[in-house]
Amino acid sequence: MKSWLLLLGTIGWVTAGDVLFIPSTLYPVHAQTMSVLARELAERGHKVTWLEIGPERSDIVLHQQVSREFWPAQFGDRTLQEIYQFKNHTSHSELWNPQYTNENEQTTGWLASIRLCDSVLSRSKSKFDKMVEKQFSTVIVDDLYNSCGVLMAGLKKSVYIYWSMTGLRTESAWANQSPSPPSYLPVAGTGLTDDLTFSQRLYNVASYFKQLYIHQHIVQPRIDAVFQKYYPGVESTFEIERNASINFVNTPPIFDFSRPYMPRVNFIGAIQCRKPKELPKEFTSWISAYPDGFVVLSTGFTVQWNKSPEHIRQAYLDTFKYLPNLLFIWQTGLPNSSNLPSNLLVKPWLPLQDLLGHQKCRCHVSHGGLNSVIESVYHGVPVVGVPLTSRGYDNLLRITARDSGVMVEKSEFSGEILTAAINEVIENEKYKKEMLIFQDMVIDVPYTELYHAAFWVEFIERHQEVPHARSGADHLNFLQYFLVDVIAFFFFVIFCTLSIIYYTIRTVFRTIRSVVNGVRGVPKIVSRGKKNN
């Protein structure tokens, strides 16, 4: 018996790893998503360390066995503080402006993360060095707005997982060598589907090279400057990103438009999704009073409702009044008041998955946040999308392209339009039917995405590297990757061949012409001679 216990203990010791998580702190949803995998690994017996670098420690609740570290850092810029820390920047009220798409969100986020990284290294480089010296079997790094996370992965020289909290973006696909043909694959932020006209393909190609240029020639050089400032000689950001052992993507495999990708890319979207739990009595008492069901309205961490224009809030309230037979459960920080419609339940935060999984949930009004949209698919609830940013628009396109919901543009937004959209989704059975088909394709797999993600972490711990998952493209430059050198060589050969043929033919014709002219010219000369005689 003792020998069996010893064997089991040895097996547990061998298989359990030491994992370091480094999430981005600019957007809480990133850490919230990563915490799900951290909890799973801790429950499997792994030693998990969680490192946050930012102006404030997040409110994310971690598993009790997760070792948590927080290193304070400052932006050193008032505008960045207002955007990410105080959330009182004008951009929060501009979200509802039809012309505002927040297309510079990604560049601004990276520049903010560079300042945070510079700040923490200037204050706590000794802490950083000690963390580098610690032995971890795997490092898991958020691939957005996480400069110090990239540096940690590069300095440790250990295997690491690069986790995209969005879909597989252009620059991420370039780093892991997954082909992203702009001929049919829409670039993030373009608002396009995979059915492109000629003019749309022109725009898509321009957007493709623009995103690569911004990341590789604006963002990465600034990150490298900070790296070289504190660690001269360290690898470039480009090389560190390319050296990731595994890439996680925060979308289900069939959520996005069909695309090619490398074997080291694993789609683990819906990792946070689960079966619904029983709702608190406060919700059930409201829901039971409305036989026609209820509608959920959520905006996640994105919208500061106290910054929204009055006419926007009034449009929502008008919608609730137009549909008195439905209960509306609205996630908003606005205070309760006697002026609110009687069919409205207001909460600052919602048990969203428990509500979406309830049998009386009729539809989900979403701003287009990736996690909330995926949760709608997972629970089979059609969506009415009100996109506030270009990223949200892209996420909702994946729903509307499959007839699993409708979208209301900001430029058309009103109480009447929103009411019509909700009625359309609820009364037209097509949307529910298509969403259930979409749901079935996402969940009809022999494992959960959480199990899938945990498997790959443990796979990397056991094997350390996956050489067969890498391609020869890792060693190619831009011109070689797109076969510019080969195409140029072919054109050169064709040009030389055609030139040789041309000059050969011209020479032959000139020779023939001169011979002919020579033959014709002899009699004339002779006749003249005779005449002179």
From Swiss-Prot:
Residues 1-16 form the signal peptide. Pfam families: UDPGT. Gene3D superfamilies: Glycogen Phosphorylase B. GO terms for molecular function: glucuronosyltransferase activity; UDP-glycosyltransferase activity. GO terms for cellular component: membrane. The chain crosses the membrane at residues 481-501. Belongs to the UDP-glycosyltransferase family. This is Putative UDP-glucuronosyltransferase ugt-58. It comes from Caenorhabditis elegans. The gene is ugt-58.
